[in-house]
């Protein structure tokens, strides 16, 4: 009976659509989370006491905002941000609204990941660039970000996997994807096979993200032939 029900879902492309929607929401959210989180992380590093342009006031305010959003459990934050989604999109339902709430939940997390990666760059590298007369922008763009690239890529893997887990939570807010399939067609209908298939598919997606991210990271950390 369970197998027949699962095959019916498969034949109706419900499982396949859930995979696509999960991947779509994960990567679109990751993209915009980094559009917001990357500059925010750079500013946090720059204004830190050991940064290029220390500014305690700016760093304290931004740090408080980031920590405030990071301290709220993801599902509660997503519920709280529904009005913001409605303000931006005119609706509080659907994947568009869910993606907005996901971005707001993920961006502060990304900002801290970026800041942590930038702090791993040796101070001597920055000092050498300053001694050569580079401007702060040149140091950030041509020295800091390239030096931190392997760590940034590693952090992006963790961030993307975390955002993937958020998409499953989004099913409770009306979002689609494998989370919705697991809840509606699995849990609510006592179809454990459907739930476990969704779990396995999410695991596969995570592994693919990890493999791709690790491969890209190795390309930047492996010594060149000239070395």
What are these regions (language model features)?
Residues 1-17:
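Short, strongly hydrophobic alpha-helical membrane anchors
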Residues 2-3, 172-180:
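Peri-membrane helix termini and adjoining interfacial loops of integral membrane proteins
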Residues 15, 19, 23, 65-68, ...:
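Hydrophobic alpha-helical elements at and bordering transmembrane segments
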Residues 16-119, 154-161, 201-209:
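Membrane-water interface segments at the C-terminal ends of transmembrane alpha-helices
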Residues 118-148, 188:
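Short helix-to-coil transition segments within interhelical loops
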Residues 136-166:
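Transmembrane alpha-helices
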Residues 178-215:
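Hydrophobic alpha-helical transmembrane segments of polytopic membrane proteins
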Residues 220-225:
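Conserved small/polar residues in nucleotide/adenosyl-binding loops
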């Amino acid at each position: 009976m369970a197998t027949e029900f699962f095959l019916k879902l498969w034949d109706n492309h419900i499982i396949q659509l859930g995979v696509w929607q999960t991947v779509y929401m994960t990567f679109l959210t990751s993209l915009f989370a980094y559009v917001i989180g990357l500059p925010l992380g750079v500013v946090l590093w720059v204004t830190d006491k050991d940064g290029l342009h220390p500014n305690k006031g700016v760093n304290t305010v931004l740090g408080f905002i980031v920590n405030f959003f990071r301290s709220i459990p993801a599902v509660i934050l997503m519920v709280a941000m529904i009005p913001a989604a409605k303000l931006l999109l005119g609706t509080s339902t659907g994947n568009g609204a869910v993606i907005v709430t996901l971005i707001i939940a993920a961006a502060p997390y990304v900002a801290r990941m970026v800041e942590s990666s930038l702090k791993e760059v040796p101070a001597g590298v920055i000092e050498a660039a300053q001694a050569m007369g580079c401007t702060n922008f040149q140091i950030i763009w041509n020295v800091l970000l390239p030096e931190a690239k392997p760590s940034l890529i590693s952090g992006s893997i963790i961030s993307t996997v975390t955002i993937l887990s958020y998409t499953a939570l989004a099913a409770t807010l009306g979002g689609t994807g494998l989370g919705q399939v697991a809840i509606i067609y699995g849990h609510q209908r006592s179809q454990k096979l459907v739930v476990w298939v969704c779990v396995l598919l999410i695991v596969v997606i995570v592994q693919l993200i990890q493999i791709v991210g690790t491969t890209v990271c190795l390309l930047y950390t492996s010594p060149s032939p000239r070395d």
